[in-house]
């Protein structure tokens, strides 16, 4: 069984967000981490590997420095890694990104393809389902549990107020929630092994059945018009009054803010 996991190197937004003048994220000025939903998807794949002996390959699209998250994944237990990087792929929105990844996947053998639900630098949750559409694969999103059953997978899919249990024949695509599991840590031996392994690097020429018009910035139907950090909330006000005075004070504040 072959499992491919799509991971992404993203800025660690917990340390604050920085933007370029054109509204895009200033990734060079921020720490980079493996996207949390993707890491949960990787852990799910590694648990299937532990149970079945499956081969796990990690795939990412990004700058050459994204090699770091691929090596982190191999240190956790992934067998192989593929980096898709090329200048012509830069500036891609979700459509161009999914087109690129689908073009790479057409060169690979896989039974199961796992992505994270969404990346914390965009929160669109579009790339996984779009890849499935490009490749004609069944897709189950928002996975809270994944089990292999012969030539099928059984997935517990999270909804707002309930769970659905779904079964799909492989090959198929699953998008994983960060709540799916607690990802394992890298081991010292895994780190040494990951440093010795080679990462396969693919460029535009390695993408199969893809038109240049669907790649990178020029292949992106959407563009960032404006981006900004969250506006900090004002500090709360604490008052120490008796009940009658508190009511009068609150009514006055509500009127002042035109709430009543």
PLM features: residue spans?
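N-terminal glycine-rich FAD/FM-binding segment characteristic of electron-transfer flavoproteins
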Residues: 1-260
């Amino acid at each position: 069984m072959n499992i491919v996991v799509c991971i992404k190197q993203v800025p660690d937004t917990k340390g604050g967000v920085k933007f370029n003048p054109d509204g895009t994220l200033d990734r060079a000025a921020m720490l980079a981490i493996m996207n949390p939903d993707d890491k949960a998807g990787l852990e799910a794949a590694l648990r299937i590997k532990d149970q079945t002996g499956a081969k796990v390959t990690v795939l990412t699209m990004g700058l050459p420095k994204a090699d770091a998250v691929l090596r982190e994944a191999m240190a956790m237990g992934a067998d192989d890694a593929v980096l898709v990087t090329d200048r012509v792929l830069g500036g891609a929105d979700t459509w161009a990104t999914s087109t690129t990844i689908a073009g790479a996947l057409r060169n690979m053998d896989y039974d199961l393809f796992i992505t994270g639900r969404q990346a914390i630098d965009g929160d669109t949750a579009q790339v996984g389902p779009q890849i499935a559409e490009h490749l004609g694969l069944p897709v189950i999103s928002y996975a809270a549990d994944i089990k292999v059953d012969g030539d099928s997978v059984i997935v517990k899919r999270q909804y707002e107020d309930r769970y659905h249990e779904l079964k799909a024949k492989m090959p198929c695509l699953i998008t994983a929630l960060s709540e799916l599991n607690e990802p394992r840590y890298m081991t010292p031996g895994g780190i040494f092994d990951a440093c010795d392994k080679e990462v396969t690097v693919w460029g535009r020429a390695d993408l199969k059945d893809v038109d240049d018009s669907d790649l990178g910035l020029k292949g992106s139907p959407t563009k960032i018009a404006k981006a900004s950090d969250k506006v900090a909330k004002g500090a709360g006000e604490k008052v120490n009054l008796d009940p009658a005075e508190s009511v009068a004070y609150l009514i006055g504040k509500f009127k002042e803010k035109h709430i009543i």
